[in-house]
Amino acid sequence: MHCFPCFSSPKNKKSSTTNETNDNNEPKPDDRRRAEETEEIEQSEGTSLKIFTFRELATATKNFRQECLLGEGGFGRVYKGTLKSTGQVVAVKQLDKHGLHGNKEFQAEVLSLGQLDHPNLVKLIGYCADGDQRLLVYDYISGGSLQDHLHEPKADSDPMDWTTRMQIAYAAAQGLDYLHDKANPPVIYRDLKASNILLDDDFSPKLSDFGLHKLGPGTGDKMMALSSRVMGTYGYSAPEYTRGGNLTLKSDVYSFGVVLLELITGRRALDTTRPNDEQNLVSWAQPIFRDPKRYPDMADPVLENKFSERGLNQAVAIASMCVQEEASARPLISDVMVALSFLSMPTEDGIPTTVPILSFKDKSMSIALSRHDSNLVSPPPELATEDDKSSTSSGEESSLESEKESVSKNEYKKKHEEEDSSMESDDESDSNSEHEKDQPPKPIDEKNQAQSLKIKYRYSWEDIDVNDERLSSKSSQKSNDESTSSRYDSDRDQDEKGKEEEEEEEAEEKHTHIEHIDSSKTDDDQSVYFDNDDDSGDDNGGSLHRIKSDVAIDSIKE
């Protein structure tokens, strides 16, 4: 009687234990799945990402019907769907099953993507990791892709004008710059192309289909992806990536340059309907890059030349830098973004209303743009310092010249007291030399824009300073000479008044002078020297003047 309760109690305890575990002492699949979902929810609490079941997304896309297919990329297919719970229209990307990440690895990457938030990136709103299914849910962009508007426009739609194209390029560069410089860790796009740039109703671009790859060690443009699988699109992929799978941030810059060329030319990156030498857009454009006169021929014919020639030259220069063969020769996307900010500005008659001073991290971009337009490059700060120094030095030199002139005036006066005829000849020679020196310098020809930049920022600043110094010194010397000559005239008048007194004294001392002259005939040159008593060695004074003795004797006899 008492045995039944005793045996029944242990039996019930054992049965409850078998319900929790299987024969191998492991949790049942339902419990394991419930635990994983709980862990996913806990990890997703820090983000705004939603977790969807496969059934929800299958219902939203009508079981992934062909009519809902939006496109197919390197990572899978994209379907248009409507969430039954909220009525929101979304884009569901069903990733390929080969090479699938584990659930935790996939979740970690998706959570990292969920933290990326920029106006020019398509927003990730949720994901699904149900069994072997891996799906991403994005906001739906209704305007279509850049490829549709450029290469497959609707019959009733107008072609994009030049300003709109440059604004799209600038905004796309902003999104790519966010992935390269702002995201942590940096994200390599890997497959940037016109079909992955989506446009909303306002033609604002949003980059899509980026980022499902871990990034390896490294910094800056040396950041490399771990995956060795080449996922890019031929025509957009950088040469180093196509040849050896070497993927860096500069690989994205190359792809962006191809997209920019598409916006400029209206051609596809790869068009098999064209002649063999024109099928690849970059190969066709490379020879034209070397001849700026052919740049207008690159413009999309549908633009009907309604663009600024200067803007076209700048855009082509930027694109040529981006598609360089060597990755190290390409600019940073941040520099590309800064350069495009100028081209995307509102214009009046093809000229921007305001001209910014551009600042680049890499000098190569500044050099490339300066070859086409001097308005984008400001004079180096060193030139301003040199100008200040030259003005100061010119002031010092002018003061020195004035001092020299004051000294020369005294000497000038002494010379004119002794010899009138020699000074008259000197005045004539000085006036002739001054007339030759006062000829103005030839003006600098800045009609050629490409040449004016070189003249303005390398040579003309120094030449103008030197010419200004010479002109200022010449003018000061001329004014000093005029004042000296006026003073000499007054002194000569005084000398004439005292001439009569000197003649009387000379008459009294006539005999003494004759004796002095006779004694001087013993010299070799038979001459008398008058010394100015100045040992300074200056060219303007201190020289010895000679008067022939026979002339002096004749004057005395008279």
Curated annotation (Swiss-Prot):
The subcellular localization recorded is: Cell membrane
The residues that hold ATP are 70-78, 93
Question: Matching InterPro entries, A to Z?
Answer: Kinase-like_dom_sf, Prot_kinase_dom, Protein_kinase_ATP_BS, Ser/Thr_kinase_AS
Q: Where is the composition biased (Acidic residues)?
A: 419-431
Q: Which residues form the active site?
A: 191 (proton acceptor)
Keywords of this protein's UniProt record, alphabetized?
ATP-binding, Cell membrane, Kinase, Lipoprotein, Membrane, Nucleotide-binding, Phosphoprotein, Serine/threonine-protein kinase, Transferase
User: What is annotated about its quaternary structure and interactions?
Assistant: Interacts with PRK6.
Instruction: Quote the protein name from its UniProt record.
Output: Receptor-like kinase LIP2
Protein's organism? Arabidopsis thaliana (Mouse-ear cress)
